[in-house]
């Protein structure tokens, strides 16, 4: 089931929640709506579901205009952040609920419902919980049951609103990998909302970055992370260092160092901001012509990763550097020592006020 959104707008009073959004989601695609709070991602998801009506614009499923269609007629499955399981029902009864409340003409037999429920419980690897109640399950298990319940009605589209937001970090990481494998198996067009950059990068086929009701960029995780279209996307997708830069003849100059900048090949010098991610900086223990002298101010070891905070000698600008713990140990430096840093890559955005 493909989804096509054309010039969709939604206001709540004077607040612009969704602003002229155009988006196409292919059949079987797993798409992440990623953005900070208030960016419009959940409102857009609810418009797709039919839980909110757009002020203007068109929503199509497989080319059919369903903009004014009631949520019950759209064939969507919805999973919320807080499970929404019925506490007084067993797991089996929760998963079966959407089938048992169908009109008699379209309702499967009890045997067919039982077969479907047990099949779904096996799919989410919880077939042994059929007779238990939600209170007897962990948060991660409850969310998987909520997903099984959404799948029971064989939705054309699966919509997930921050499905792992209420879970601890380890369970979230496990469920992300599980959701990716599950999607590859069932191949239902899926849209999920998240503010977690790592979650979107790990799980999605396509990421749609939203801010202030608009789409800032959309593309594969690799495209969005490696080639951000603007400063907002660059800063939102992970830590970044900012340097004032001068750009001319395909090179950017940061202080006393020069970095290739082939996207800016013009002959006239321009000012801009150079964005450099912490892992794109090399640390040296000896001075070199094309490096910045720094002092090591803080070292934080997080498992296999070493995170450094260094201060530049000239203006004491704080710079974040990330490398493996093994690489850091090999450098043989510690807090208070001098070192030299060399950005391997930078992305320069030109213009005043950037």
Swiss-Prot record:
EC number per UniProt: 7.3.2.3
Listed InterPro entries: AAA+_ATPase, ABC_SmlMolc_Importer, ABC_transporter-like_ATP-bd, ABC_transporter-like_CS, CysA_C, Mo/tungstate-bd_C_term_dom, P-loop_NTPase, Sulph_transpt1
Topology with respect to the bilayer: Peripheral membrane protein
Top-level division of the source organism's lineage: Bacteria
Keyword Membrane part of the UniProt annotation: yes
Catalytic activity: sulfate(out) + ATP + H2O = sulfate(in) + ADP + phosphate + H(+); thiosulfate(out) + ATP + H2O = thiosulfate(in) + ADP + phosphate + H(+)
Name of one Pfam family that matches: CysA_C_terminal
The protein's name: Sulfate/thiosulfate import ATP-binding protein CysA 2
Source organism (scientific name): Shewanella oneidensis (strain ATCC 700550 / JCM 31522 / CIP 106686 / LMG 19005 / NCIMB 14063 / MR-1)
């Amino acid at each position: 089931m493909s989804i096509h959104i054309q010039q969709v707008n939604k206001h709540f009073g004077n607040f612009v929640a969704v602003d002229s959004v155009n988006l196409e989601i292919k059949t079987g695609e797993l798409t992440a709506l990623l953005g900070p709070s208030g960016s419009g991602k959940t409102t857009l998801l609810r418009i797709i579901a039919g839980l909110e009506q757009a002020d203007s614009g068109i929503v199509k499923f497989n080319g059919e205009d369903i903009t004014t269609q009631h949520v019950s007629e759209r064939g969507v499955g919805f999973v919320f952040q807080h499970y929404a399981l019925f506490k007084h029902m067993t797991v089996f009864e929760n998963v079966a609920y959407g089938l048992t409340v169908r009109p008699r003409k379209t309702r499967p037999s009890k045997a067919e419902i039982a077969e479907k429920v047990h099949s779904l419980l096996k799919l989410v690897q919880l077939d042994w919980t059929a007779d238990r109640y939600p209170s007897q399950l962990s948060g991660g298990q409850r969310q998987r049951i909520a997903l099984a319940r959404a799948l029971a009605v064989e939705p054309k589209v699966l919509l997930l609103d921050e499905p792992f937001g209420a879970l601890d970090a380890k369970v979230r990481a496990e469920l992300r990998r599980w959701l990716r494998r599950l999607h590859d198996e069932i191949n239902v067009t899926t849209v999920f909302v998240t503010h977690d950059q790592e979650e979107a990068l790990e799980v999605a086929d396509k990421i749609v970055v939203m801010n202030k009701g608009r789409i800032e960029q959309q593309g594969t995780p690799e495209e969005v992370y490696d080639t951000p279209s603007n400063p907002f996307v660059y800063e939102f997708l992970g830590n970044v260092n900012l340097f004032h830069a001068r750009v001319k003849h395909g090179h950017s100059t940061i202080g006393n160092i020069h970095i290739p900048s082939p996207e800016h090949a013009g002959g006239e010098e321009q000012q801009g901001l150079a964005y450099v991610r912490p892992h794109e900086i090399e640390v040296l223990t000896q001075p070199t012509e094309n490096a910045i002298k720094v002092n090591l101010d803080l070292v934080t070891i997080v498992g296999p990763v070493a995170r450094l905070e260094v201060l530049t000698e000239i203006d004491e600008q704080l710079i974040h550097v990330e490398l493996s713990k093994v690489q850091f140990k090999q450098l043989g430096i510690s807090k208070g020592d001098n070192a030299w840093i060399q950005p391997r890559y930078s992305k320069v955005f030109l213009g005043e006020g950037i």
